[in-house]
Amino acid sequence: MDPFPIRSFLVSQITHRWRGCISTVASSLAMDLRQLGHLLAVVEHRSFSAAARALHTVQSNVSTHVAKLEKELGTVLIDRHSMQPTAEGLAVVERARRIRTELQAIQDDIISMRHEVAGEVRIGCIGTTGRWMATPLLGELSDRHPALRPVLVDATTTSLAPRVLNGDLDMAVVNTPVVEAGLETEPLFDEERIVVAPGDHPLAGAGTIDLATLAEHRVMLTPQGTTFRDAIDRELEAVGLCLQAAAEVDGLRLLASLAYQGYAPALLPASAVSGYPEGGWSLVHVEGLARRSVGLVRNRRTTPSMPVLATRDVLRDVIREIAPHQPGIHVTLEP
């Protein structure tokens, strides 16, 4: 005889109800990958009609899949007026993007294991670094892994970091540190802030100057409010100095081009001055300015595919080989 009949009865009732709950949840979450794919298309293309065109289907099909997903989850995922995801929709979209990335990684891994490393790898890169890194990187990828399809995206750190986080990019070379907590960062190199001076300017040939000397001359700068400019202004303000702007140019590559064409000296990150042919200009190092760090970021919540790992290894090798020969760049990548 059961010495605890009441307890046994309660346990049996709880177990029965728990099994019923599990069955109900499982049956209500009959979502499929097509529903998630259609939801992502609506969010990324910002309308049902644009999503339908991207998916090569009719709008009613997209609407049906999204509506079924909303019914199964018991909540609205897309606000039909603003066409923006709701709070619940954002949560689903974040996970759906990771699922999409993992599914593509599965296919790429199997192909790479059976044959050669193959598949598409999406690489973001800040423009200043891309100027001298892109050509050797793409060349080395082609030599080592001809079946790889690299896609290179040139943009700013503030644009690239979120795209790595949401799965649009597999990795990105950006200025660090980044604020996104979901990103994993690997240091690549630090770069000095350097002056490019026309050959006939008093700074030309100086080799190295201090902050006081820099403040005596009018130089081209990025605008106030940009990360690069604000960091420099803070450092000079800390020692009681202020820069004189000959012009403010919103774009480091344009700023470098103007300096090389002889308009005026420009204060630039070292990677922005790499790759230009020699001419009637001079590079001047500045003592007292902190270096700017550059690193490789990837989403820490996903497992990189074999093509992504192969691309990362090639990128590391290119940095180790090429970066030490660029003026003002100091490799921080581990051996």
Predicted regions: what they are:
Residues 40-58:
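Short helix-boundary/capping micro-motifs
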Residues 70-87:
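A short LG(V/I)-centered, amphipathic sequence patch enriched
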Residues 72-73, 92-114:
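Alpha-helical linker/hinge and terminal dimerization helices associated
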Residues 118-181, 249:
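Central regulatory/effector-binding core of bacterial HTH transcription factors
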Residues 156-161, 165-169, 174-175, 225-282:
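Hydrophobic hinge/microswitch elements
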Residues 180-219:
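Flexible hinge/capping segments at coil-to-helix
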Residues 181-187, 191, 253-303:
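Beta-alpha-beta core module
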Residues 204, 218-239, 304-314, 318-331:
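Secondary-structure junction motif
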